[in-house]
Amino acid sequence: MESSDIASRIWLIAGPTASGKSAYALDLAERIDGEIVNADSMQIYAGLRVLTAGPSQEETARAPHHLFQIVDPALGWSVGRWLEAATQALAEIQARGKPAIVVGGTGLYFRALTHGLADVPPVPETQREISSLLYAARGETEFREILKPLDPEAEARIESGDRQRLVRAHAVAITTGKSLTAWQTDTKPALAPGSWKGLVLDPPRAELYARCDARLAVMVEQGALDEVRALETRGLDPALPALKAVGYREFAAHLRGETSLDQALDAARQETRRYAKRQLTWFRNQTPDWERIVP
């Protein structure tokens, strides 16, 4: 590839937690003189660098990093806000004539870049509640039969057990008279086709789980408990997105004296593995054409 092509190309590097994607992205950035943009919904928050495996000072000194630890945990964040910030960062990087490397594990961020973000009208809270109650009353199988004539593509696409997305698809169709799939089809991608290359790091399952376990031990050594303790003293709403970071709830329970450290670590290991499995499933289903890399 010519140097001009490398500079203009945007690299999208995705993968499950602990797959080694951050190290891969940093190595690539050093080789091609690129800049890194965060695509992880938890690494966006300040004060959780260790718990979310964000880049260290040594790593940020090796290549420019953008959109890491920029939002206070007391504040919310959304795909739309990330997309706006990311597209601005990408434009600035390319204006400097540098390659841009977007790395993270939040699939919806990558989808927003490559498929666009649907401008769906707000759904009233009352309709969300009605759709949720309908799901609870009828169960998933019958709810899917109700959703199918409203949005057959969404019904077929949404995985079993994904109540939130099923309920949203129903609520959007009822509120707007137009299926969520139709809204999404009408969107334009933020990145032009051909301007980017997608890679998914896909280590063997056993190796990935071993990496997850090892990472948790390192997090404790590097101060993850101190990060959780600092946020707990602020009395933040447990429903805030930042406090849903994998491991936060388990370590917070330990700090409150509800569990031993070993129990907290065991619970965090299980949650980390479940999270990694969900990510693997998402990237397998949503990015089938991206190149797979075995680290």
Curated annotation (Swiss-Prot):
Pfam families: IPPT. The keyword Transferase applies. The record marks 106, 128 as: Interaction with substrate tRNA. GO terms for molecular function: ATP binding; tRNA dimethylallyltransferase activity. Its EC number is 2.5.1.75. Disulfide bonds: none annotated. Substrate binds at residues 17-22. The keyword Magnesium applies. ATP binds at residues 15-22. Signal peptide: none annotated. It catalyses: adenosine(37) in tRNA + dimethylallyl diphosphate = N(6)-dimethylallyladenosine(37) in tRNA + diphosphate. GO terms for biological process: tRNA modification. Keywords: ATP-binding, Magnesium, Nucleotide-binding, Transferase, tRNA processing. Its cofactor is Mg(2+). Residues 40-43, 164-168 are annotated as: Interaction with substrate tRNA. Catalyzes the transfer of a dimethylallyl group onto the adenine at position 37 in tRNAs that read codons beginning with uridine, leading to the formation of N6-(dimethylallyl)adenosine (i(6)A). PANTHER family: TRNA DIMETHYLALLYLTRANSFERASE (PTHR11088:SF60). Monomer. Belongs to the IPP transferase family. This is tRNA dimethylallyltransferase. It comes from Caulobacter vibrioides (strain ATCC 19089 / CIP 103742 / CB 15) (Caulobacter crescentus). The lineage of its organism: Bacteria, Pseudomonadati, Pseudomonadota, Alphaproteobacteria, Caulobacterales. The gene is miaA.
